[in-house]
Amino acid sequence: MKSHTQSLLAESLNALKQQGVVPADFEARIQVDRTKDKSHGDFATNLAMMLTKAARKNPREIAQLIIDNLPQSSHVEKVEIAGPGFINFFIDDNALANQLMDALNSDHLGVTLPESQTVVVDYSSPNLAKEMHVGHLRSTIIGDSVVRSLEFMGHNVIRQNHVGDWGTQFGMLLAYMEELRAANGEQAQIELSDLENFYRAAKVRFDESEDFANRARKLVVALQSGDEYCNKLWREFNDISLSHCHEIYERLGVSLTRQDVRGESSYNDDLEQVVADLDSQGLLSESNGAKVVFQEEFKNKEGEPLPVIIQKADGGYLYATSDMAAMRYRSNVLKADRALYFVDLRQALHFQQVFKLAKTAKFVREEMSFEHMGFGTMNGEDGRPFKTRSGGVVKLIDLLKEADTRALELVRSKNPDMDEAELAEIARVVGIASVKYADLSKNRTSDYIFSFEQMLSFEGNTAPYLLYAYTRVAGIFKRAQDVDLSDAKIVLEHEKEKDLGTKLAQFGEVMNRVVNKGQPHALCAYLFELAGAFSSFYEACPVLAADTEAQKKSRLLLAQLTAKTLKQGLNLLGLETLERM
């Protein structure tokens, strides 16, 4: 309905141009918004006020001209002018009911799919050789929700898990493994849990021993030069680390696979060429022995240009170099239309600089869009970055295990007689859903407080509330299995039926916001509002005890569409649903 309203306004504007009321070359972005007050209709636009200067008329006069030139539409019941010149559209109830019937019979809930694009999504991307910690949670689950949403909207999505599988940390690990095997024999085993210990011990040795640090640096060079022994160990470290990552992904219900991994090492062969190409274009400068690029748009507090360091004085490459190589690959090989980067907001300047430089150097197609989807930090209840009681980094697996334990206690307290296996399965779904939803429901650019107590509550905008709302709606059908809905039609008569129908019709608008702006919290807010609208409808409008058979069937269809929408929405967030809680 929103796009239909915009098209009506576009036709009216064209008519005004033809009549000479508005200059023919006038360009206007027609904005249509949902009204907050139903007495003001369903949609409102400020188009008349945008045309005031161009038409040299007052806004209410222009608003009337716009209305006079609107094409006839069976979808619109009436149009009114409000305030200084807003135009309010009231949607016809029968048109809304027909839209809901179409949604009920559609694989995409009636959502109009945009033109398909190829979209690269860079997310999760942990540094290997360490266990994943809570700092990896936001990129992983926000990115995955947007990926699911993009695919639902018909786009071709290429997942890119740009893992940190190269660099100094591997030199430290290789040097430490040499020492370990010298002491324990060539067959010293590497186990998953050892990686953290290896890394910590290697870091201590690296910081304390100059000999060890020099050895580690030499091993990095050997690794980069293709040394067979170093490469074998490097692959072993990576394989163990990736196995751990994918255990986490599976537990989280994230769609990343091994085939989506394309780490920093993938671009090693391109780094020298990146430097050479920047140099050939005269973009490189030298600063303290390093090769850098200065861009006038980026300055420090003193007004001096900020450098993008491309190659260190010792010949080593940096994130900017590998990011430039990755951008070139994503543009020219993958032929992407958009590339979305789900990386901490603290990297905003870095991405602004490399995005600009890649376009300046013509490494990427001019029409391709590069978008940093930054996010804030997850904090403890003290408002500081989330830590263990001892002040250490919280391992992601430990967080998920605690969520399982707390969810099991919660579910058992509400279902003391339930079978233990069923309790465990419900707790698994509720625990993971609660952790994910608590994050996804927050605006990604904001920091947020992590609280098990809040996220496991059955009240408010939480996963348990929405999961229960779904089971409640689904439960209606279990009690109505004998009702034949083949000839049923949705009819909107009661105010609460219309409110629920209006909310159901907004799903497509919300999905466009999720995929265009990378904002899953908009979908969370919508699902919470939808559950509330259904609750109000269910209290005011008896379903199985409706006055007539036709009314009962109509309300069952509304409940069915609500259940489909809740389930689809939760799935797009990466949350499983339950038929019973």
Curated annotation (Swiss-Prot):
NCBIfam families on file: argS (TIGR00456)
Q: Give a GO molecular function annotation for the protein.
A: ATP binding
Against SUPFAM superfamilies, the record matches this protein to:
Anticodon-binding domain of a subclass of class I aminoacyl-tRNA synthetases (SSF47323), Arginyl-tRNA synthetase (ArgRS), N-terminal 'additional' domain (SSF55190), Nucleotidylyl transferase (SSF52374)
Compartments, as annotated in UniProt: Cytoplasm
Q: Which Gene3D superfamilies is this protein grouped with?
A: Arginyl tRNA synthetase N-terminal domain (3.30.1360.70), HUPs (3.40.50.620), Isoleucyl-tRNA Synthetase, Domain 1 (1.10.730.10)
EC assignment: 6.1.1.19
**Species whose genome carries this gene:** Shewanella piezotolerans (strain WP3 / JCM 13877)
Q: Where is this motif: 'HIGH' region?
A: 126-136
Database matches in PROSITE patterns? AA_TRNA_LIGASE_I
The main location class comes to: cytoplasm
- Gene encoding this chain? argS
Record text on subunit structure and interactions: Monomer.
UniProt enzyme class: ligase
From the UniProt record, give one GO term of the biological process aspect.
arginyl-tRNA aminoacylation
What the record says about family reads: Belongs to the class-I aminoacyl-tRNA synthetase family.
| Reaction(s) the record says it catalyses | tRNA(Arg) + L-arginine + ATP = L-arginyl-tRNA(Arg) + AMP + diphosphate
Q: What is this protein called?
A: Arginine--tRNA ligase
| One GO location term (cellular component) | cytoplasm
